[in-house]
Each structure stands twice: as structure tokens, then as C-alpha cells.
């Protein structure tokens, strides 16, 4: 196309991102590599403008009385590389609906918990599930002990049964969230593929769609293509590791 040469491409990517460029200008890229979600499904996904947008938080639907929500959290160190993120999902009935998301690569782990809890309280005291492999354990600890939020989901280690998610656990084998083991990720990715392609999980967020276009197979797992991010995709994996299908 006239004017759209390599210099234009470099400038466009510099002003947006590699992921955004591929979604908007290289439609043939969708599913052209080993993406978790099929290319046909990726091409059918559309995004809407959020009804609220503020400092990384995008909201698509207001809370509905008596609906059940879960917030799944992936935590970064807040040094501008990876993003701290969470996804808010209405799990009242199928199809589940992603109604909001947060994504920020500068928020410090000490400040992140208050943002999570404020949103959780607004959405009918939503359940919160954190990934606690690294700095996420610190975030979950603040939510549990400092902010004393009642609906933080815990995990109990049960040997061969793996991690059991729920509330009211105690003892040495209890964690303040889920550890992203190979098994948990495998289940979450499998469910993510099945439920999105069967339209049992619905979302209209630009960043989530963008991440899924570069969420590809590497060895026996899935992760972001080099130079891209998968923080929101992993929030979906965390949430869908809870679902039994």
C-alpha cells in the first residue's frame, strides 16, 4: 500500500506496540503461528470501547445485583517490563463474561492490593484469586492480612490431588493463592481454548484479544511470543484453571 513501507511500520510500532500493529495492520498474522486459540476464532473476535477507563482499568459493564464475580490476578514487579494485571469475570452463569480488566507496568506491588480490593468490593465482594509463584504472594498477603478481605481464595496442597481452591483452609500446606505449576497451566490453557472457541467465555477487550493473537505454543506449553506480553492471557488461564468441564 502506498506510503506503508518499512519506515512507516517502524514508526507505527514505536507509537503503539508490536502486538497492536499486528492486530490492526497484519490481519493475516492471526493464527498464522501455533496460537492457542484457532485462527478462525481469533479473526471473529471484536472489541468494544470501555464505558470507563482510568490508569489501566477498563470497565465494560457495571456490577449487577446478586451476580457472582471473580478477579484473577497476575503480579509483576512494577519496573516497567511485565504488567501487573487482573481480569474481572461474571461467573453467574454460562457464558461467563469478562466485564473489566486492569493492566499497568508501573504499579508497585505494595499499592496494587488496594486497587484489587476496591474493585472487588464494588463487584459484590468478588472472589479474588492471585497467582503466588513470585511477588504475587506479597500482594495476596496484604489482601488477606492488612486489608482483611474475606473473599480471597486460598489453595490447599493435597498431594496427588494437586491444589484445591476454596476458603477456610489452614495449616502449613495452605497458600494464599494458586501456584502456576505445569499442571495448573495445562488445565487452564485447555479450558481457555475450549470455552472461548465454544463461546462459553465472552470478552470484548482490545488488549485481551491482542495478547491472544501472540499467545503461542512453545515446547509443551503456551506463552507470549518474544517481545509480546501475556499478562492478561495468564489471568484468564488462572481463572479457567478453576473450571471443570
Where in the sequence are the language-model features?
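Generic signal for short, ordered secondary-structure residues
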Residues: 3-4, 171, 214
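RNase H-like, metal-dependent nuclease domains and their acidic two-metal-ion catalytic environment used
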Residues: 7-157, 186, 190, 194-243
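Charged, glycine/proline-rich intrinsically disordered loops and linkers
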Residues: 158-176
